[in-house]
Regions:
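N-terminal domain-start signal
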Residues: 1-206
Length: 206
């Protein structure tokens, strides 16, 4: 890596080092594991870097799924900080890395539709992307079928690859070809973003 590249990443490196310092220690995780109930666990987390994510509301205290959803918001906010402080030529790659959570959400939504779950049951199993543009997941669930949900992905990066996958979905009566198409789409777009980096950065990234 050249001196100019090192300088370009200095700011984001400092931010990441600070985030590493906020990670829970093994000892803290062991203490949290010993908590007798969710309310006690949340109270203990109030002493950690997750405090801002877990206001002691009824929703988080009563539901471990909701508590986990709120905790995951911290990762979204940390990603945002990293992206904002990264060199401009690397930001779209970092955004694409973050979109792996969108991929997981998309597959979870399609699985939920397949088994007939409603939006209220699905929504807090998803990764919270907060301010980042994402797919119309609530509308997809409300559409009622996998086919109609995929139709709502018109004019998105997924459309071209999901059309042939939908044919296989009907033929095989399985979501597997759809999920494979989603994964391949993601990794191809990630590879394309790597190709936009400076040559030396491409070598390191690969």
């Amino acid at each position: 890596m050249t001196l100019s590249s090192v300088s370009a990443y200095a700011n984001v490196h400092t931010r990441v080092r600070g985030m590493i310092g906020n990670l829970l220690s093994d000892e803290t995780i062991a203490r949290l594991s010993a908590c007798p109930d969710l309310g006690t666990l949340i109270a203990k987390l109030d002493e950690t870097s997750y405090a801002s994510c877990l206001a002691a509301s009824e929703e988080t205290i009563k539901s471990s799924r909701r508590a986990a959803y709120e905790i995951r918001k911290k990762l979204t906010r940390d990603y945002k900080i990293i992206i904002e402080h990264a060199p401009s030529f690397a930001r779209q790659l970092l955004v694409q890395l973050f979109r792996l959570y969108e991929v997981d959400n998309l597959k979870a939504v399609l699985r939920g539709i397949e088994v007939g779950e409603d939006w209220e049951k699905i929504r807090y199993t998803l990764f919270p992307v907060e301010d980042y543009p994402t797919l119309p997941f609530a509308d997809m669930v409300q559409s009622g079928t996998v086919e109609s949900a995929i139709a709502l992905l018109h004019n998105t990066d997924y459309e071209v690859d999901l059309k042939p996958a939908l044919t296989r979905y009907h033929d095989e009566e399985s979501l597997f070809p759809v999920e494979v198409a989603i994964d391949l789409n993601y990794w191809q777009r990630l590879w394309d973003q790597i190709d936009t980096l400076p040559k030396q950065d491409q070598k390191i990234t690969r």
